[in-house]
Design a protein with these regions (language model features):
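Sec-dependent signal peptide recognition
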Residues: 2-9
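Hydrophobic h-region of N-terminal signal peptides that target proteins for export
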Residues: 9-17
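Signature for the C-terminal beta-barrel architecture of outer-membrane proteins
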Residues: 19-21, 60-65, 99-100, 129-238
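Surface-exposed strand-loop-strand hairpins of Gram-negative outer-membrane beta-barrel proteins
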Residues: 29-49
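Outer membrane beta-barrel
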Residues: 56-153, 175
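Extracellular loop and loop/strand-boundary signature of outer-membrane beta-barrel proteins
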Residues: 36-41, 78-80, 127-130, 187, ...
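Outer-membrane beta-barrel proteins
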Residues: 33-37, 76-80, 112-117, 165, ...
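Short N-terminal segments immediately surrounding and downstream of signal-peptide cleavage
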Residues: 19-33
Length: 238
């Protein structure tokens, strides 16, 4: 563990000390085959672990601040030989929450949209349905949320990308008697500027249904994406 992270942990534990919790996620997988390059083992395995530390402190009956720090460890083996070893921050954010407002700053997950596969709104995440950990890379961002009433929530964000430029966006989520609507925009002024616009909808009825549609436009091209899906829960053992 690097010294700055240890110093940060001590400082936050002292500041937030009202509530401290920890958890972790571990996974392992193996792969074997008969078409193996010379000198390589027929068996490959991977191990991963994400320990997470959470701290929180109440400010009033309706507001609190909290902090989360998670580190991801990944190892890949060929037989008993170590092929790769990665260690990096997975989440590192601080948040203020009140009855109608939330602000979160740091390395965090930003995910939205109703679809689970073929996701047109997978703009800032790497969630893969084939990955049993259901984990995604984080983004360095400031995200704000407002909740004017029970049927409306408004998001805004500023994200720092790998080129150290800031991109900006926002989202509105509306609940109605016929379903849940989402409207999203994002502007990325990087080397090749892009504008993104999206509409999504989910209806939870006898048969659930959802829609995601997005337009990504730049000087060179326009990309249109649409995902439509439905689901039905069988009344077994209910």
């Amino acid at each position: 563990m690097k010294f700055p992270n240890l110093a940060l942990l001590i400082l936050l534990t002292t500041t937030f000390g009202q509530s401290l919790s920890s958890k972790g996620q571990f996974w392992a997988s193996g792969l074997t085959g008969n078409d193996v390059p010379t000198g390589q083992s027929a068996f490959e395995s991977s191990l991963g672990y994400i320990p997470t530390l959470s701290l929180s402190r109440d400010l009033s009956d309706f507001s609190f601040i909290d902090f989360e720090w998670a580190v991801r460890f990944d190892r890949l083996y060929s037989g008993d030989s170590l092929l790769s070893n990665h260690e990096k921050n997975h989440r590192l954010w601080a948040r203020y929450t009140s009855e109608k407002f939330e602000a979160r700053l740091g390395l965090q997950k930003i995910v939205f949209g109703p679809s689970q596969i073929l996701r047109s709104l997978s703009w800032f995440d790497t969630i893969d349905l084939k990955d049993p950990t259901n984990q995604t890379k984080g983004v360095d961002a400031l995200r704000l949320k407002w909740f004017p009433n029970n049927s409306l929530s408004l998001w805004s964000w500023a994200i720092q990308n790998e080129q150290d430029t800031l991109s900006f966006g926002g989202r509105a989520e509306i609940s109605s008697s016929i379903g849940e609507f989402g409207f999203t925009v994002h502007s990325d002024p990087s080397t090749i500027p892009k504008q993104r616009f999206a509409l999504d909808f989910r209806h939870d009825g006898y048969i659930g249904s959802w829609l995601e549609t997005a337009l990504i436009t730049s000087e060179n091209s326009d990309i249109k994406l649409t995902t439509i899906g439905a689901d039905y829960t069988l009344p077994i053992l209910n």
